[in-house]
């Protein structure tokens, strides 16, 4: 088994599937089954989901919302997605807990590092929601923070593309893929892997990132089995 403990980062937009908004039940079910497969391998799993399928704080501020209020709305969107994933996992027999960065019992338990690690070691999938609990931080940064805190072996960034390219492969047909790349090169090239704060946190704390296509069913298990289907970012 490639990694013992992982932090899986999923984008909110990915939950939309082919819809333009909200949560696609089929996509949610696909993700839940992939997570179950890996959980049954004995992998300890922490998950962070974005909220962009419902509301994005930064775009809200561009439309006239107060930035802090907008970011708080985005945090609430991540909680909605986390509850949806929790429900989908529970429906197929996967023990899980939703932990929130802001107190909102009984919707979820208030997050602490020790509570999360204890739950994962007991076989629960932990879903971390509400970002960092503070405005001005993206869910990518929240993922980096949680990955570092729970001492994950890697952050797996599930996207709709199969890794990191020299340019956006959906716009530039000449873009070429990296199988692995250093943090320094990511920063020097200005590649849009995650925001700068998130990248620097992972670099400073030696947390590697593996970017892969989560939309292809079975890919999460392939990553755990050591198949090279994405891009590894490392020091």
Model segments located where?
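C-terminal catalytic "cap/lid" subdomain
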Residues: 1-235
């Amino acid at each position: 088994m490639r990694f013992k403990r992982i932090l899986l980062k999923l984008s909110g937009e990915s939950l939309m599937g082919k819809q333009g908004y909200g949560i696609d039940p089929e996509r949610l079910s696909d993700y839940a089954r992939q997570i179950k497969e890996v959980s049954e391998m004995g992998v300890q799993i922490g998950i962070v989901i974005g909220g962009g399928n419902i509301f994005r704080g930064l775009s809200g501020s561009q439309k006239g919302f107060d930035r802090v209020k907008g970011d708080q709305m985005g945090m609430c969107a991540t909680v909605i997605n986390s509850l949806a994933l929790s429900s989908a996992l529970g429906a197929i027999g996967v023990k899980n807990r939703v932990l929130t960065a802001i107190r909102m019992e009984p919707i979820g338990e208030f997050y602490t590092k020790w509570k999360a690690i204890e739950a994962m070691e007991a076989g629960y999938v932990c879903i971390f929601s509400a970002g960092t609990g503070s405005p001005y931080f993206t869910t990518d940064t929240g993922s980096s923070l949680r990955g570092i805190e729970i001492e994950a072996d890697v952050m797996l960034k599930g996207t709709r593309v199969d890794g990191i390219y020299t340019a956006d492969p959906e716009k530039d047909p000449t873009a070429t893929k990296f199988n692995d790349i250093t943090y320094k090169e990511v920063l020097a090239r200005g590649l849009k892997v995650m925001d700068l704060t998130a990248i620097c946190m992972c670099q400073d704390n030696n947390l590697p990132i593996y970017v892969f296509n989560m939309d292809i069913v079975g890919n999460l298990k392939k990553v755990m089995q050591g198949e090279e289907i994405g891009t590894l970012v490392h020091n």
